[in-house]
Amino acid sequence: MVELMALLLIKEDGSGKLDANSYATAADCDGYHDGHLYATAWTGATQSKKEAALVMATRLVDSQFQFNGFRAHSEQALQWPREKCPDPDASLLTISVLGWVGDNFVEPDLVPAAVAQATCEMARELLIVDRTAAPAGEGLDTVATAHATHAATGTSSDSTSSTTKYNKSDTRPIISRVAQAMLSKYGALVDGGSGAVRLVRA
C-alpha cells in the first residue's frame, strides 16, 4: 500500500522558488481574515484544510489570470515574481512622449500584496464551495409544463411536456468578483474570458 505524503505548503517569497505552491501561508490569511465579517468558513477550518485551500487557490489564480510582464526566473514554479509588470500604485512616475517611464514596475523580487490577498480571498471561497465544479445541467434550464385535457374530449388523462433552454446569465466565476478586482490591476483573465462555470438555479 502506497502511503500518501501530507501536503507541504511552500510560500513564494519573491525569490522565484522552484517548488513554491502558494502565495500566502495560513498565518498570512489568518491576518487577512481578521475582522472579516464572513470569515467563518476560514476561521473554523483546520490547519490542513486551510493550507490545501491556499494551494488550490494559488493554482486557480495562476491558471485563470495572465499577468503583465514576464517571470523573473525561467524555472520558478508560479507566475510571480515578475519582471516589467506595470504597477498602477507606484509613487514615482514620470510621463514622457514615449509613455510611462521611471519606477513604475512591480519590484521583481516580491509578490504584490494584492495577489497574496486575492489568494486568501479565494481560499476562503473554496472552503465554502468548489468553484471549479459545474453543477449538473451546465446552465441548461428545463421547464416542465402540464397540459390538462378538456372535459369535452371525454378523457381525464393529463400530459406533461418540457422545454430546455440555456440561461447565459446563470454563471459563477471561478475567480470570485472580489479576487478579480484585486488581480485585474496586474493582468487579465486568460483569453479575456469570464472565467466562469455554468450554473443551474434550483
Regions of interest found by a model, annotated:
Residues V2-A202:
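Divalent metal-cofactor coordination and adjacent catalytic microenvironments
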